[in-house]
Curated annotation (Swiss-Prot):
<feature type="binding site">
    <location>
        <position position="21"/>
    </location>
    <ligand>
        <name>Mg(2+)</name>
    </ligand>
</feature>
<feature type="binding site">
    <location>
        <position position="30"/>
    </location>
    <ligand>
        <name>substrate</name>
    </ligand>
</feature>
<feature type="binding site">
    <location>
        <position position="105"/>
    </location>
    <ligand>
        <name>substrate</name>
    </ligand>
</feature>
<keyword id="KW-0460">Magnesium</keyword>
<dbReference type="GO" id="GO:0051262">
    <property type="term" value="P:protein tetramerization"/>
</dbReference>
<feature type="active site" description="Proton donor">
    <location>
        <position position="21"/>
    </location>
</feature>
<dbReference type="InterPro" id="IPR023214">
    <property type="entry name" value="HAD_sf"/>
</dbReference>
<dbReference type="InterPro" id="IPR016965">
    <property type="entry name" value="Pase_PHOSPHO-typ"/>
</dbReference>
<keyword id="KW-0479">Metal-binding</keyword>
<keyword id="KW-0378">Hydrolase</keyword>
<feature type="active site" description="Nucleophile">
    <location>
        <position position="19"/>
    </location>
</feature>
<dbReference type="GO" id="GO:0016036">
    <property type="term" value="P:cellular response to phosphate starvation"/>
</dbReference>
<dbReference type="GO" id="GO:0071456">
    <property type="term" value="P:cellular response to hypoxia"/>
</dbReference>
<comment type="similarity">
    <text>Belongs to the HAD-like hydrolase superfamily.</text>
</comment>
<dbReference type="GO" id="GO:0004427">
    <property type="term" value="F:inorganic diphosphate phosphatase activity"/>
</dbReference>
<feature type="binding site">
    <location>
        <position position="19"/>
    </location>
    <ligand>
        <name>Mg(2+)</name>
    </ligand>
</feature>
<dbReference type="InterPro" id="IPR006384">
    <property type="entry name" value="HAD_hydro_PyrdxlP_Pase-like"/>
</dbReference>
Amino acid sequence: MAYNSNSNNNNNNIVVVFDFDKTIIDVDSDNWVIDELGFTDLFNQLLPTMPWNTLMDRMMKELHDQGKTIEEIKQVLRTIPIHPRVVPAIKSAHDLGCELRIVSDANMFFIETIVEHLGISELFSEINSNPGYVDERGTLKISPYHDFTKSPHSCSCGTCPPNMCKGLIIERIQQSLAKEGKKKMIYLGDGAGDYCPSLKLNTEDYVMPRKNFPVWDLISQNPMLIKAAIREWTDGQSMEMILIGTIEEIRLEEEKEKMLTSAENNCKMQTISIGINNVHHEPILPRALRVSQSS
């Protein structure tokens, strides 16, 4: 499911794509809700029996059956740990004119609740995640982004869960951006599911893997498979420094390219002008007037 907002502040050539769990927030949002509401034992008991996305839908039913309300889930989400420099980093990237998107294997309900609480929901032009909604009984329903019960997604990377291939989402984003003109992408993530989209990035793009997390380990096995420039980060503070530094670097390079193009065009115009001035022209004289002879 993709959510689109009217965030149209992007006035540069950069799209920043964030993972959510352990990237924007410091923990896994699914585990946080389950643990904080006291359902860890049941979760661990059921985990070997079904896919993660299916299990989360089952756990939301269990929460409802045990009397847990949607408001209680929201309250837990509002206390989720986040590094104090992450929100300023996101705001700075937006203020610098970047288009911001989220691609996450969490769910829409969790993400929207958290970004709204943080006051940054309007900064993202699109959120791609597993659908999450409250049904008529007051139960939070979570379904897969890709319905793997009907058909598998076409990814053969081997690191993507059955319900979501982030690489396919990035390819769709790239296709839409191509219609708008050339754009550079910065992708931030931490998990194994962030490896496939990292492989899809182009040479002018940047990938920011969280160091010593699964995506970093996968990239480190063979960095030559990654066409994009690799800029690792460790926590919210280093994320802010590296992200904003990369944005400024891209903007500086684009300004240099514009100045160079402008200078080349000026040189061409001067050459044309000089060439015209050096062409020999015969003087153009006015036609003589006939003067009548008076007798």
